[in-house]
Every structure is written in C-alpha cells, then in structure tokens.
C-alpha cells in the first residue's frame, strides 16, 4: 500500500519485497523491528513524490547512521546476519551491509534485492543493493552503505565486471540441475538461491566455442576465470 510499491505486480512483490531471508541468516522478527525503526523517518514529501531513487538515497543516509562499511571484522564474520547482529557490530563488509540495507528497504515496502558482482581487477566479489526497474523507477540502479548510487549498465561496468548474481531466496532450477551432476564441483553451483543478472550489469554476448572430442561426453562445460586461487565459472553450457 506504499506509493512507491502500489504499481508492482504480484510477482514483483513476491520477488522484491516479500522474501523473509536473503541467505542463511538466523530467523528473526526483522520486518516489524526495522519497520518501527525506519518507516516513521520517511517524510510526507517523499511519500507524495514516490520516487524510488530519492527515497533510496534518503533511506541509505538514515541506515548509515547505524551501520557503516568496514573490514575490521572480515576474518570473524562474513555474509548474512540478522539486523540486530549487524547493528551490534556496527561496521561490516559489503555483503553484510547490503543484506542489512535490503531488509530495511523491504520492511518499508521498497522493492530491492542483494546483488554480488565479480570484478576483473580484484579477487574478491562486491555486494550492493539493486533497485529494479518498476513503474516508479524507470532505470534500475544500485546503492549500498559504502557506495554512491550507480545506474546499472554503465559502460565502465561492462569493462570491469564479468558476472553478477542476485540473491533471491528462491531456488534456481538451473543451478539445481548442476547440483545433480556429480562431475560439477560444488562451488560451481552453491548457493542455489540466486539468479544471474549479468545482463543488467553489463553488455553480454553469445559465443560459440569448439569442444574437444574428449569433453563431449560431459553434460556441462564451463568457461572459467582463475580468481582468488580457484576457478570461477563465467558461463556454463549444456
């Protein structure tokens, strides 16, 4: 019933607002907790304007008062935490920050999701919050606690990234098929609750590559990049 979400389809609502987890964080009553903490801060002018971009930037400024980006706890905790765990630590790496910001936005009825980008110039991925294209947001963008707003599909991102995932907390059937193949390494399909959104992040191309006869008996083949001392799949083919 929020102005910025009233034109969402049912599928969009289920995908961007309804999910109660982004990953493997402990279950908690985070929605009512964060709604009470943040929703009253939204001004009447923002309510009337219903502009997702302005609202997202305003909410992120409020979020940064409670949680900041920092790397001092990287060796102790990474990934998905409950909101109260995040606030207690105060400064966390990018995935935890994006997870917290996404839950705040969803608690206030703002459609979004966590994305994870693989950069060609660094060995570690980066996470942010994607605000998708909707009736009230004509151009998708990303924004998180440690980064400024950036529209998706900028030329610099095409040069810098090679794969982007969105965490949806719904099982990806294609990844589930990979998991059933005993020849596919576990790290190539875990986690299952994500969808490929690389085409939103950068320009993508179809390629045809010759397959050696010795590999034609395999169900799947992967085009990979050596990243962080291990192979990471850029794209898979069946």
Regions found by a protein language model. Give the residues of each.
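Hydrophobic/aromatic-rich core segments of domains that either
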Residues: 46-62, 76-80, 84, 89-90, ...
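Alpha-helical and coiled-coil interaction segments, frequently adjacent to or embedded
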Residues: 1-3, 20-22, 66-67, 139-238
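Secondary-structure boundary elements
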Residues: 1-89
